[in-house]
Curated annotation (Swiss-Prot):
The keyword Cytoplasm applies. The gene is cops5. GO terms for cellular component: COP9 signalosome; cytoplasm; cytosol; nucleus; perinuclear region of cytoplasm; synaptic vesicle. Probable protease subunit of the COP9 signalosome complex (CSN), a complex involved in various cellular and developmental processes. The CSN complex is an essential regulator of the ubiquitin (Ubl) conjugation pathway by mediating the deneddylation of the cullin subunits of E3 ligase complexes, leading to modify the Ubl ligase activity. In the complex, it probably acts as the catalytic center that mediates the cleavage of nedd8 from cullins. It however has no metalloprotease activity by itself and requires the other subunits of the CSN complex. This is COP9 signalosome complex subunit 5. Keywords: Cytoplasm, Cytoplasmic vesicle, Hydrolase, Metal-binding, Metalloprotease, Nucleus, Protease, Signalosome, Synapse, Zinc. Its EC number is 3.4.-.-. Residues 53-190 form the MPN domain. GO terms for biological process: negative regulation of apoptotic process; positive regulation of DNA-binding transcription factor activity; proteolysis; regulation of cell cycle. It comes from Xenopus laevis. It is found in: Cytoplasm, Cytosol; Nucleus; Cytoplasm, Perinuclear region; Cytoplasmic vesicle, Secretory vesicle, Synaptic vesicle.
């Protein structure tokens, strides 16, 4: 189907999907090599050892679809994969039966039993990869680690190394048309990382800024890339043949109406806060640092405003294009 292939190609280009020529090259599991890596534990000598994270197209789709199914509630799952030098390779993922809220996910005993049974059954059918990380969603508030996430990941790295934490924002994924995903690893307690300069800017809601700021120096982000093999291509074609119509029949303006409204309210609160600080600063003398902080907050609010506006314009443009294509066919 032509429409299906175009939609699939657009999605792959948006997310810089790379194709691996040889299936064996990426799927071959060298047990001896993995055991040698686990025995050497190079990550204990360098707290910034892992720098890259590769995610298979199939694992990516499974995680995004699971995150989207949770709506405004956080969801959680586990990832299977392996290590290749400084790269953590995520081959597959599966959802966990956990209780989710709008701010956290809680794994109960049943989830741990399910996790152990799934990994054991996967090995019986030839999937020899071990658990390499966990993922959860942040619907509408970006990809970063909260205080609870940092504690969970520290515990995982202490007892289940090598382990990576992946965060997906399904709401921003729909709004921007590109997968919003981040992979992170935490530093050991007491470790002070060197100043790495400003990281890539992302919009953080006002009610999450404090939690983000307190813990942002306790972990670092890995460079994420996506790949697919010829086997993945077959599976993706089956998925796209089922879901590609949703691209034409849905609108991000309608699907994410609540999210967009929330963004506008959040922006309003940030501007009011900045205005109040500037007002107080005008009565104080010699407080240049205070002025710089206020200006910095205004600059961030401006960037947030631009991002929200651009996403709304893109949604409107897609609706106009679809209207021109399907509703205004000229008759000759």
């Amino acid at each position: 189907m032509a429409g299906s292939s175009v939609a699939q190609k657009t999605w792959e280009l948006s997310n810089n999907m790379q194709e691996v020529q040889s299936i064996d090259e990426i799927y071959k599991y060298d047990k001896k090599q993995q055991q040698e890596i686990l025995a050497a534990k190079p990550w204990t000598k360098d707290h910034h050892y892992f720098k890259y994270c590769k995610v298979s197209a199939l694992a990516l789709l499974k995680m995004v679809m699971h995150a989207r199914s949770g709506g405004n509630l956080e969801v959680m799952g586990l990832m299977l994969g392996k290590v290749d030098g400084e790269t953590m390779i995520i081959m597959d993922s599966f959802a966990l039966p956990v209780e989710g809220t709008e701010t956290r996910v809680n794994a109960q005993a049943a989830a741990y039993e399910y996790m152990a049974a799934y990994i054991e059954n996967a090995k019986q059918v030839g999937r020899l990869e071990n658990a390499i990380g966990w993922y959860h969603s942040h619907p509408g508030y970006g990809c970063w680690l909260s205080g609870i996430d940092v504690s969970t990941q520290m515990l995982n790295q202490q007892f289940q190394e090598p382990f990576v934490a992946v965060v997906i924002d399904p709401t921003r994924t729909i709004s921007a048309g590109k997968v919003n995903l981040g992979a992170f690893r935490t530093y050991p307690k007491g470790y002070k990382p060197p100043d790495e300069g400003p990281s890539e800017y992302q919009t953080i809601p006002l009610n999450k800024i404090e939690d983000f700021g307190v813990h942002c120096k306790q972990y670092y982000a890995l460079e994420v890339t996506y790949f697919k093999s010829s086997l993945d291509r077959k599976l993706l074609e089956l998925l796209w043949n089922k879901y590609w119509v949703n691209t034409l029949s849905s609108s991000s303006l309608l699907t994410n109406a609540e999210y967009t409204t929330g963004q506008v309210f959040d922006l309003s609160e940030k501007l009011e806060q900045s205005e109040a600080q500037l007002g107080r600063g005008s009565f104080m003398l010699g407080l240049e640092s205070h002025d710089r902080k206020s200006e910095d907050k205004l600059a961030k609010a401006t960037r947030d405003s631009c991002k929200t506006t651009i996403e709304a314009i893109h949604g409107l443009m897609s609706q106009v294009i679809k209207d021109k294509l399907f509703n205004q066919i000229n008759t000759f």
